[in-house]
């Protein structure tokens, strides 16, 4: 079996790599995993990958197997995705291509649109055009929010909807654009494809090993990080007002669950689109209360935001002008849930309750919200 993976140094991609290698080992598969990665400064792509495979958060089964033997499964293609070429076409013939690289950026700023579109859509198109003549199947890792603002029950098919989509930001738009491109081109080429869509990724929850670990803190973690450091810096906590739909929730799914679903699904021809999501979104008001309690910021309130809303203090201004304006479209969105019947039949969705959400935030706080950059 041959698999090509992009994004192996990322928060999700690294776990996909872990799971593929574990499958190779435990099932005695004669496999080759091609990793498209690039150097970072003076650190080569090989050194970056080796660092991930010999770290404190590497699964024990891989550490026990040993780095030297693990690298026997790997071939690292040291290049930037924007500069990829087909010079190694014979090696990768009939491989599964899992495109997990991308820029997660929920910015609503106009000056970020082109960058977000390039990193997610243009590079996806370039990669697809380069590799599609040689591969067996193209698996695109998108986002469960790529169909924009939704209400009610959300099914797995995002490409036969009878209404116009309303995207909250350039990221959602770029991801949906990429999905449409992949589906259209694969149909033309008669190339099998799969669109897999995680929701908001949280820390590990399968098993006890490195529980709640995640290498990059995004989305709800960023709110927790902001108020954690604000609480440490300020003796007097200024009141911050939040506009939240109290009926709505944030769909959070553990990173290791997402990776396992991808690795257990990419060979299935009966699945074209799949949302990798929780069966129950975590209530936004309860989530905010847990975050603020855990990071020690007590002075906040929930309001109905009006058109003449103006900042009442410095902290409120800093919050809204940094991450708040990007998170608000999710905090005020209509209530919805996802149909997880098919997903749960592949692997049972781990329960996310108040205790486990608290532990996610606590893990991040104890580790000072420090991302792991390799």
Which stretches of residues belong to each language-model region?
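Mid/C-terminal beta-alpha module of Rossmann-like enzyme folds, strongest
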Residues: 261-326, 368, 372-373
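Conserved Rossmann-fold NAD(P)-dependent oxidoreductase catalytic core, especially the SDR/UDP-sugar
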Residues: 96-99, 108-113, 118, 122-173, ...
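Glycine-rich phosphate-binding loop and adjoining beta1-alpha1-beta2 segment
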Residues: 32-71
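Conserved Rossmann-fold cofactor-binding substructure of NAD(P)-dependent oxidoreductases
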Residues: 62-94
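NAD(P)-dependent short-chain dehydrogenase/reductase
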Residues: 185-249, 255-257
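Amphipathic terminal alpha-helices
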Residues: 28-31, 37, 337-374
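A hydrophobic C-terminal alpha-helical subdomain
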Residues: 229-242, 307-349
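N-terminal Rossmann NAD(P)H-binding glycine-rich loop of SDR-like oxidoreductase domains
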Residues: 3-26
């Amino acid at each position: 079996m041959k698999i090509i993976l992009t994004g192996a140094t990322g928060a999700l991609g690294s776990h996909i790599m872990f799971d593929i290698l574990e499958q190779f080992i435990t099932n005695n598969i004669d496999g080759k995993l091609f990793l498209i990665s690039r150097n970072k400064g003076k650190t080569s792509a090989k050194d970056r990958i080796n660092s991930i495979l010999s770290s404190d958060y590497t699964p024990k089964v891989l550490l026990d197997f040993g780095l030297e033997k693990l690298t026997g499964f790997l071939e690292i293609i040291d290049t930037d995705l924007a500069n990829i070429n087909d010079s190694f076409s014979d090696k990768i013939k009939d491989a599964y291509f899992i495109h997990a690289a991308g820029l997660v950026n929920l910015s609503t700023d106009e000056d970020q649109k082109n960058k977000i579109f390039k990193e997610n859509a243009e590079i996806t198109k370039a990669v697809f055009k380069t590799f599609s003549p040689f591969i067996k199947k193209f698996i695109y890792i998108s986002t469960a929010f790529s169909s924009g603002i939704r209400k009610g029950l959300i099914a797995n098919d995002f490409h036969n909807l009878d209404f116009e989509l309303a995207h909250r930001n350039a990221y959602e738009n770029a991801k949906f654009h990429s999905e449409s491109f992949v589906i259209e081109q694969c149909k033309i080429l008669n190339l099998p494809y799969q669109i897999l869509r995680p929701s908001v990724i949280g820390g590990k929850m399968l098993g006890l090993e490195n529980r709640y670990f995640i290498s990059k803190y995004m989305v709800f973690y960023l709110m927790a990080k902001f108020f954690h450091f604000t609480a440490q810096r300020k003796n007097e906590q200024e009141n911050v007002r939040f506009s939240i739909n109290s009926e709505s929730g944030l769909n959070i799914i553990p990173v290791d669950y997402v990776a396992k679903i991808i690795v257990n699904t990419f060979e299935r021809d009966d699945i074209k689109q799949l949302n990798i999501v929780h069966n129950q979104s975590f209530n936004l008001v309860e989530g905010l209360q847990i975050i603020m309690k855990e990071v020690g910021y007590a002075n906040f309130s929930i309001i109905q935001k009006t058109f003449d809303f103006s900042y009442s203090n410095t902290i409120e201004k800093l919050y809204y002008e940094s991450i708040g304006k990007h998170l608000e479209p999710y905090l005020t969105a209509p209530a919805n849930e996802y149909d997880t019947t098919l997903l749960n039949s592949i692997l049972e969705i781990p329960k996310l309750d108040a205790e486990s959400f608290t532990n996610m935030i606590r893990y991040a706080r104890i580790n000072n919200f420090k991302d792991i950059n390799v």
